[in-house]
């Protein structure tokens, strides 16, 4: 069985790739360059994780997105919310809009679908999850359902996108990742990279962007030792 894993190098996609590995899929990973500030670190993480999982990694250039994106992920204008803001819907929605890249997931998953069909893979594994689905419309079960509906008409082999984390929040994802590492006797999570910024030291996170703050909270609430290095703890 073949599968494509959309692997940004972040915690969610790293754990999703572990899920695919645990289900005995022959994995190929794809990582996208959409002109994001953290590109270099994401590629390093994705390639390291792919190596550990014995998977080929392909970096796909969709840098044209940067030409029309006003996202902080492209411009470097990264919001830094307070801890208490993470569960405030209005403030989280504002932060979401500041980092929203136009149609990013639609573009990435469409390309991944073509890749999957081309190598006769039956599934695309994505790291879409419950916590991000609260504010990001392209992380919701409705998005997954309707995207798969389009694949019924857009691909001959009717490849399907799956999101094994779609019912999980970040602490649950961290916990699942640790369980899968123990089950598979692999070490992946410490090489994942969630930060919105491109810090000079490999795998070093800023600790102040929303993604870093959610990562910190995930390990803390899961009761798991956080292997991440942060500039600001």
UniProtKB/Swiss-Prot annotation:
<dbReference type="InterPro" id="IPR018317">
    <property type="entry name" value="QueC"/>
</dbReference>
<protein>
    <recommendedName>
        <fullName>7-cyano-7-deazaguanine synthase</fullName>
        <ecNumber>6.3.4.20</ecNumber>
    </recommendedName>
</protein>
<keyword id="KW-0436">Ligase</keyword>
<comment type="pathway">
    <text>Purine metabolism; 7-cyano-7-deazaguanine biosynthesis.</text>
</comment>
<feature type="binding site">
    <location>
        <position position="212"/>
    </location>
    <ligand>
        <name>Zn(2+)</name>
    </ligand>
</feature>
<keyword id="KW-0862">Zinc</keyword>
<feature type="binding site">
    <location>
        <begin position="7"/>
        <end position="17"/>
    </location>
    <ligand>
        <name>ATP</name>
    </ligand>
</feature>
<dbReference type="Pfam" id="PF06508">
    <property type="entry name" value="QueC"/>
</dbReference>
<comment type="function">
    <text>Catalyzes the ATP-dependent conversion of 7-carboxy-7-deazaguanine (CDG) to 7-cyano-7-deazaguanine (preQ(0)).</text>
</comment>
<keyword id="KW-0067">ATP-binding</keyword>
<dbReference type="GO" id="GO:0008270">
    <property type="term" value="F:zinc ion binding"/>
</dbReference>
<feature type="binding site">
    <location>
        <position position="209"/>
    </location>
    <ligand>
        <name>Zn(2+)</name>
    </ligand>
</feature>
<keyword id="KW-0479">Metal-binding</keyword>
<dbReference type="GO" id="GO:0016879">
    <property type="term" value="F:ligase activity, forming carbon-nitrogen bonds"/>
</dbReference>
<dbReference type="InterPro" id="IPR014729">
    <property type="entry name" value="Rossmann-like_a/b/a_fold"/>
</dbReference>
<keyword id="KW-0547">Nucleotide-binding</keyword>
<dbReference type="GO" id="GO:0005524">
    <property type="term" value="F:ATP binding"/>
</dbReference>
<feature type="binding site">
    <location>
        <position position="195"/>
    </location>
    <ligand>
        <name>Zn(2+)</name>
    </ligand>
</feature>
<comment type="similarity">
    <text>Belongs to the QueC family.</text>
</comment>
<feature type="binding site">
    <location>
        <position position="206"/>
    </location>
    <ligand>
        <name>Zn(2+)</name>
    </ligand>
</feature>
